[in-house]
A protein has these predicted regions:
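Asp-based, Mg2+/Mn2+-dependent phosphohydrolase catalytic module
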Residues: 1-13, 103, 119-120, 124-222
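Catalytic-core regions built around general acid/base machinery
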Residues: 97-109
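Short active-site oxyanion
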Residues: 109-113, 166-169
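Residue-level marker of regulatory loop/turn positions in helix-turn-helix DNA-binding domains and
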Residues: 94, 115, 147
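Small/polar loops that bind or transfer phosphate-bearing groups
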Residues: 23, 114-115, 173-174
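Ser/Thr-centric signal marking residues that sit
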Residues: 20, 116, 169
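N-terminal helical cap/lid subdomain that shapes the substrate entry/recognition surface
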Residues: 3-100, 119-121
Length: 222
């Protein structure tokens, strides 16, 4: 799908964090490998049983705020998820195209707002290890509002909090259900990321334009 952004009529760019500005390899390793392994060892069950149990637990709360909540998973699984996140902090890395794109947005006068479903502790750890905050104008965790990006109430709350105009906003995310929610609210430009995890094959979007390198946007932006 062709990317057609009228940059003259965009004043705000909302950006997801994990998979969009940061390599999703961190989260995929943490939630798909480390958590099941740690839980299985603690419970004395096989890796296969641990994987299946964790998969069921994830599926039960998918697209809700609990899915992203470290406190919820600590209580649910009996693991210190916050401490585990802190220990894995050095694994968090920026995408190669993140800083050039954010710098270009700044140079062209666009407001750069992080909008992440990440738990505040998760966000703080990643900011510490990546320096991402210095390239953004505002950082928002949806936990502050009580709703994830999949929920229309979140979009209303963010609009009230930031004063953004949906008609003049570009939103970039690596989740099609979340892009759908943004489009439903009225965000004019919704753009998907095809390579959120540098170690996995690219993904495809059915309803939104997408790309694998933000540097492709810079010539039209400048």
């Amino acid at each position: 799908m062709h990317i057609d952004i009228d940059w003259q009529n965009v004043d705000t760019v909302l950006l997801d964090m994990d998979g969009t500005l940061l390599d999703l390899a961190f989260d995929n390793y943490f939630w798909q490998k480390l958590v099941p392994e740690t839980y299985g060892a603690q419970q004395g069950i096989s890796p296969q049983d641990a994987q299946e149990y964790i998969r069921q637990q994830y599926h039960a709360v998918q697209h809700t705020l609990n899915w992203y909540c470290l406190d919820y998973w600590s209580e649910r699984l009996g693991l210190d998820i916050c401490a585990m996140t802190t220990a894995q902090g050095p694994r968090a890395v920026l995408r190669d195209d993140t800083v050039p794109f954010l710098n270009a947005l700044k140079a062209s006068g666009k407001r750069r707002i992080l909008l992440t479903n990440a738990h505040p502790h998760n966000l703080a750890v990643k900011l510490e290890h990546t320096g991402l905050a210095s390239h953004l104008d505002l950082l928002l965790s949806t936990h502050t509002f009580g709703y994830p990006k999949e929920d229309q109430r979140l979009w209303r709350a963010v609009t009230e909090e930031t004063g953004i105009s949906a008609e003049k906003t570009l939103f970039i995310d690596d989740s099609e259900p979340i892009l759908n929610a943004a489009a439903r609210f009225g965000i004019r430009y919704c753009l998907g990321v095809t390579n959120p995890d540098s170690g996995l094959a690219e993904k495809h979007y059915t309803r939104h334009p997408s790309l694998n390198d933000y540097r492709r946007l810079i010539p039209s932006l400048m």
